[in-house]
Amino acid sequence: MKRLLTLVVVCLASCALAQTGTPSKLQGKMKLNAGIVTEKLEETKAFYTSVLGFGVSFENEFYLLLHTPNGEDEISFLLPNHPSQQALFHKPFQQQGLYLTIEVDEVDQIYHELKKKGVEIEIDIRDEAWGDRHFAIQDPNGIGIDLVTHTKQ
């Protein structure tokens, strides 16, 4: 019985450590860069640079790497079936099951700027019970983009 109790205590302690965010071997510097496989590199570049103010970090004939206006985050786009890429990265995005969230300081300002530019608003600006104020647009690939300001509750 004492051995079983010790085993239970050790298991509970291990579970508690796992839930507290104690660093694992996978911890350390990680940077996420989402990539979308698409035929629409030119349209995508024009949308993200002219509508959202992104900059071009790198581009060639089959790859486009863009960064947010503050340079902190990046997103990439790749032509499908490109011979330089492995088969895992050949299939094009199918315009479903993906969205991006862009956190901004002043969602109302951006909302009005995009309306003035004639950008189609897919979800009108609104407040949510959980504290977000947001609206959504769609990029040329069919990706929903949720622009959000977290408000105080």
Segment roles from a protein language model:
Residues Q19-N33, G55-I102, Y111-Q138, T149-Q153:
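Vicinal oxygen chelate
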Residues E43, V107-Y111:
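Short, conserved charged micro-motifs
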Residues L32-E39, K45:
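Mature N-terminal segment immediately following signal peptide/propeptide cleavage
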Residues T44-T49, L114, G142:
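Conserved active-site tyrosine of GNAT-family acetyltransferases
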Residues I145-D146:
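Short, conserved beta-strand/loop elements in beta-sheet-dominated catalytic cores
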Residues M1-S24:
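Bacterial Sec-dependent N-terminal signal peptides
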